[in-house]
Regions:
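Glycine-rich beta-to-alpha transition loops that act as phosphate-gripper elements at the mouths
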Residues: 40-47, 146-150
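Small-residue-centered hinge/linker elements
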Residues: 1-36, 45-52, 57-135
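Assembly/oligomerization interface modules of large self-assembling protein complexes
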Residues: 32, 114-172
Length: 172
């Protein structure tokens, strides 16, 4: 017997934007191919890449205490430019390409490298924003923090238009 819909449970704080978008796209492609409605149920968290995947749902449901949102992009690292010198190690790096060692944690940060990284982040962030707007459309509240990287409870997420209702997969 054919099921009228597919239910997906999400419990993810995020991860790679590439992998999140690929999962989103595969779900949407299968939904179109099989002519199935997709219902997404957020458990503890659907934040950042987890929320990007949740966008594959035709409807998104969350527990009142679930965490949803975090529509932003983060990159992190460490800097150790003085550490090797202190312990008497000489680091040798040879590259072909003037930018091959960009953001090397053993070299001081350079402003042009930081600007480049931020430009990539802004581009990826815009892809995420566009996905949210395309999938949630007129359901979204007009809130300046919506795309700031903040995250909210399921209850607040519903008020913001990030989720459609408060329920879990076992609700009737």
């Amino acid at each position: 017997k054919d099921a009228p819909a597919v239910a997906i449970s999400i419990n993810s704080p995020g991860g790679s934007p590439v992998q999140s978008r690929l999962i989103f796209q595969r779900i949407r492609d299968l939904a179109a191919e099989k002519n199935k409605q997709v219902l997404v149920f957020v458990e503890d968290v659907a934040a950042s890449g987890g929320y990007m995947i949740a966008l594959a749902g035709d409807e998104i449901f969350a527990d009142p205490t679930s965490i949803v949102g975090s529509i932003g992009v983060v990159s992190g690292g460490f800097g150790f430019p003085e550490m090797l010198k202190k312990i008497g190690v000489e680091r040798r790096v040879y590259t072909a390409g003037t930018n091959k060692a960009i953001l090397d944690p053993f070299q001081p940060e350079r402003e042009n490298e930081i600007e480049y990284l931020k430009s990539l982040q802004l581009e990826i962030h815009q892809v995420f924003i566009d996905m949210v707007k395309a999938r949630r459309g007129g359901k979204l509240a007009d809130d300046p923090d919506l795309f700031s990287g903040l995250f909210w409870t399921g209850t607040r997420g519903r008020a913001l238009g990030l989720v459609d209702g408060l329920a879990d997969m076992r609700s009737e």
